[in-house]
């Protein structure tokens, strides 16, 4: 039993504030429920990004991910599948499924759930700083310019494994790479 599973779970209400938001890879990330809040059951967070803020191809070794799009749209690459996901639509990504996405709109906002909890611990470890505003940071370092070894090392601690170029070619055959799509689709 983990330390979080031993904590009492109590009802709560939360909204987006500077106190529960961070700048993460040139994006805004707001934590609504984390492991310590849910007895290790799940995480819920909101992510606001723009083209160029996408994560490298990766897998979540410890849990499932469910995303609900609040604004904009993406092309999600999950194994050999490609899903165009827009506002009002959702996407489920099972544990250990190789995945990433490309943002197809000027801004992209999603609510995501991970089960069991733990992914937000990785995101906190990678966060550049507390949010200074409840919008995209004016400046920041996206994954493409980040210290990738640090991301790999932190990911290992929290069950996030980044794929090698060879694994990407084999496991995400339709993924075009980190270039932005030619035709944004709001």
Over which residues does each language-model region extend?
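Short glycine/threonine/proline-enriched tight-turn/helix- or strand-capping micro-motif at secondary-structure
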Residues: 26-32
């Amino acid at each position: 039993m983990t330390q979080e599973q031993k904590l009492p779970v109590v009802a709560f209400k939360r909204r987006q504030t500077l106190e529960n938001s961070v700048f993460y890879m040139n994006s805004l990330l707001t934590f609504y429920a984390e492991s310590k809040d849910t007895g290790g059951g799940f995480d819920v967070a909101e992510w606001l990004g723009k083209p160029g803020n996408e994560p490298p191809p990766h897998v979540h070794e410890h849990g499932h991910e469910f995303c609900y799009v609040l604004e904009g749209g993406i092309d999600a690459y999950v194994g050999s599948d490609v899903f165009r996901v827009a506002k009002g639509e959702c996407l489920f990504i099972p544990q250990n499924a190789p995945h990433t996405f490309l943002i197809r709109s000027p801004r992209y906002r999603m609510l995501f759930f991970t089960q069991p909890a733990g992914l937000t611990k990785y995101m906190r470890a990678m966060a550049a700083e507390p949010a200074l505003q409840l919008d995209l940071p004016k400046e920041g370092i996206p994954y493409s310019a980040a210290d990738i070894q640090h991301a790999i090392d932190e990911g290992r601690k929290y069950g996030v494994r980044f794929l090698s170029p060879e694994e990407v070619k084999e496991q995400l055959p339709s993924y075009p790479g980190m270039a932005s799509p030619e035709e944004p689709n709001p």
